[in-house]
Amino acid sequence: MSHDLPEKTREIFGKKPYLSLYFQNVPTEPLEFRLEAAKNPKEVFVSRNGRALASSVAPLTQAKRQTDSVQIQSTDLVAILGLGNPHLIREVNAKLEPGQILLLVDKEKDLIFPLWEEWLEPVMEIPGRHLFLGESSLPLLWNYLESLPVERVSGIRILRNAASVSLEEVFYAEADIRLRKILSSKMSDLLTKFEFERIWVRNSLVNTANFLSPPNPKTRIESLKEKFAGVPSLLVSAGPNLRRQCEWIRTIRDKVFVMSCDTSLKVLLKYGIIPDGIMTLDAQTHSVFHFLGEDTKRIPLFADLVSSPPILRNLQFRSVVHSITAKYLVDASGELKREATAGSKSAESLLGPIGDVQSGGSVATTAFDLLRGLGCRPCFLVGQDLAYSGREIHSTGTHHNEKWLTLLTRKTSLEKINEAVVRKRDTRYVPSVTGAEVLTDYVLDLYRHWFEESAKSLDFPIYNVNTQGAKIENTENIGPEEATRILETFPDHGYFWQEFPAWKPEIIQEDLVGSPANFKKDLLKTIDSIKSDFSVPSRQEESYETLLSLFREKLGPWEDLRYLIRKTEVYILRHKDKLDEIRKRQLFISAILKEFTGLRRKLLAGEN
């Protein structure tokens, strides 16, 4: 194909720049791929060095049979693996809605030259259609999927061109697995958002409005970034192995900055170990049980902005250090994209930069990235079993363990309670640090993979100090004795951070963009206005689209409030053909009144 590309092709490249990469090295030798005529008139197939990659008799019939055997919904993401049958591309494309996602994947880059003009170019003109050729394009495919909004996606349909797949079975099998895994993860994230997004927004707005409120002085993690450069950190989690390591922690206390997950706090305090910080992430109030009955007045609480407001309002800490959970993705255009927790935009409009922390879904993964941001290196993991070591859920001494002690009877032991919990989980065996195998579950295994992937990208070592938990790849799995030898090469830290504002709250000086009092006042005014507007009986006569437009207009600068009813919006969008206009209105208006009443109540909680 000539470098002098037609205007139509250049227009497509303007919208999908990555496609131009396939034309940078036009082969000078005869192509091993050719478009050949089939026995049936007006039908073609691709051949590779004379080998047909589709039916050489009736490729169109083959494609129609394949597409007819798959029921494709308008909310499905569709992928074709192997492009040896051009008719399959055209038949699938014809079944899809404009904007519906179609991914065309093949191991060979040179396929683009015989297929582009007649078969691929018309498809690539349509938004949502994408082409990934060659192994080097796979990172782009994974990045595209990771950054893809899945609110309108209900599932994935993968069609395989058998002749193409048979040439590179490993490549296509791995692509198939990864496609399903990423989409499954995205759907899981979406369900999590649907479940908790309303709570995240509510908590973020309430915590922002209460930023200067007593009893706890508050600051931002941004002010502590890289202040601990070169200081070893000890991240303490509440795995079953923790109780065996507490005596060791006391011996190396002066060498490390100790960050405790909220779950492990009670265990450390029982051994007389006062951590330098506590990490909490849970947006639900039941996490208060990790702190009840403990003296935390000397310890700063590192709290994600979505953390439960009653904990920050009713318990006493040295200070509260806020952060925001955000992840960074490379989208299909190659640009870095920041995806922060719902509610963060409004918070940053008042507080300024708060500080981003990436999370793998657990308190420990969040604390790990937070320690990296502080500049701590290396990092020692303790109690990070990520497994049911000894068939236990947590170390003894945690809140869960204390609660179970009240349930003990002659017939009910701790072992029986632990066993009942384990048997409800989706369990599997994974390699242990002992060289044997240890029982874990699906969620704990996800966290393990997160640590393994994160450790790959770091320029300092991670040590997993554990004697019975799961083996974490890309880290050094060691015992306490070896960890002590490593730490002996570091000087005592002298607790220099005690002079930082988070540990010396009397010197905290926060330079805010605006006033929290005005923030709360304006927010309450917007809430009352929207509630009043949608309580009018005449709204029940208007169309859903009119109500949606009115709602967005009434939000003004408070775009984050839309997340309160996003679950309802997406539900209506997914079932737009099944719900009548009356039901759509009822769902939408009731969601607005319910969520905005709840937010108003939370904002006013604790006021005298």
Please state what every model-predicted region is:
Residues A94-I101, R253-D254, G272-P275:
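Conserved S-adenosyl-L-methionine
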Residues L81-I89, E108-L111, S136-P139, A162-V165, ...:
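Gly/Ser/Thr-rich loops at beta-strand to alpha-helix junctions
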Residues G360-G361, K411-G469:
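Polyanion-binding loop/helix "lid" in catalytic or ligand-binding cores
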Residues E121-R129, M279-Q284, L292-R298, V321-H322, ...:
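Acidic, Ser/Thr-rich peripheral helices and adjacent loops at domain boundaries
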Residues K107, I112, W116-E197, L269-R377, ...:
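Acidic/Gly/His-enriched mid-domain segments of enzyme catalytic cores or analogous surface patches
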